Amino acid sequence: VCRYITELIERGEIEKNSRFRGVQTAKIARLKAEAKCPVVGEIACGVPLLAEENIESYITLSREYLGSGKFFILRAKGNSMINAGISDGDLVVVKQQETAEEGQIVVALIDNEATLKRYYLDNRHKRIRLHPENDKMEDMFYETISIQGVAVKVIKDLQ
């Protein structure tokens, strides 16, 4: 029995449980891994709004759901990202990082104000284009911005 258990552990199908003498499937262990994400205020989905640095609360999410990295949560304010499925009041889960690929939705810090927009490089004019996902709004152009993170999930209240 010991040889079979060792073989299953080596293949990554089960994991030893350190709390007691037992094992659990690797999938259950991944589902149990959690990340405590701070809710740090509102983010403008329209005109940039000062992002609050104070932590309002924490939401615990599964690592299986998030993946690896450091995360924080902002509450969407406004309607500039409605075509991306982000509405006023939604919680946006953001992976904290300083770079982004074109087309990703980023939290951009501009003159100490944060906004949530789709990120593009305008190489011809050597500037950054932040695109609101709302046909009634126009793109915003900047020489420099500070990327605070990339939006990875949206938590909606359906009621």
Predicted segment positions?
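Short, catalytically relevant binding-site loops at active-site mouths
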Residues: 30-31, 45-46, 56-57, 80-82, ...
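Active-site/binding-pocket entry motifs
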Residues: 29, 43-49, 136, 153, ...
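Acidic/glycine-rich C-terminal interaction modules and beta/coil loop segments
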Residues: 65-159
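Amphipathic alpha-helical dimerization/coiled-coil segments
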Residues: 34-72
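Short, cationic-aromatic polyanion-contact patches
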Residues: 19-36
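A short, conserved structural fragment
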Residues: 9-17
